[in-house]
A protein has these predicted regions:
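Nucleotidyltransferase catalytic core that binds NTPs
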Residues: 1-168
Length: 168
């Protein structure tokens, strides 16, 4: 497994992997991987011949009363788990600037009225942050396929809607 921590390393690795035949599947995560995440890696491997996982604790999806700093970070364990699943590439940005450059204007996506309902009522701005980072990962990686968990139907619906709209 190739581990990348900078945008430059990511682009270089993706360029090398693009020379190989087959599709690339993306599995975005925030780390602290469990069996559900690993099942997504397995599913990605069924859908594509090359897999990339990301571990990025996205500060944009945490609200004022949610503690971004306390989110569990288990990087070494996560790396070992992904190696066992034969994930090809892992992108663990060393800092937020590797995802959202200071030079680029941050394009925050609006989840609309659906993002303000259900879970969005108690976590205002959460889905805007999720959509913004997933869109950015799509821009950086340009996967053929992306695999997401199904535990949060609202999030899954919003991501699918965004992907169809911005990445047809």
């Amino acid at each position: 497994m190739v581990i990348t921590r900078t945008r430059e390393e990511l682009y270089k690795t993706l360029k090398e992997f693009s020379k190989l035949p087959g599709k690339l599947a993306l599995v975005p995560t925030m780390g602290n991987l469990h069996d559900g995440h690993l099942s997504l890696i397995k599913l990605a491997k069924l859908k594509a011949s090359k897999t990339i996982a990301t571990i990025f604790v996205n500060p944009l999806q945490f609200g004022k009363n949610e503690d971004f700093k306390k989110y569990p970070r288990t990087e070494e364990l996560d790396i070992e788990k992904l190696k066992k699943e034969h994930c090809d590439i892992l992108f663990i940005p060393r800092n937020i600037e590797e995802v959202f450059s200071k030079i680029e204007k941050l394009k925050t996506l609006d989840s609309g009225s659906l993002g303000s309902e259900l879970c969005g009522k108690i976590r205002p701005g959460h889905f805007d942050g999720v959509l913004t980072v997933v869109n950015r990962l799509f821009e950086l990686i340009n996967p053929d396929v992306a695999v997401f968990g199904a535990k949060d139907y609202q999030q899954q619906f919003l991501i699918k809607k965004m992907a169809i709209s911005l990445h047809p």
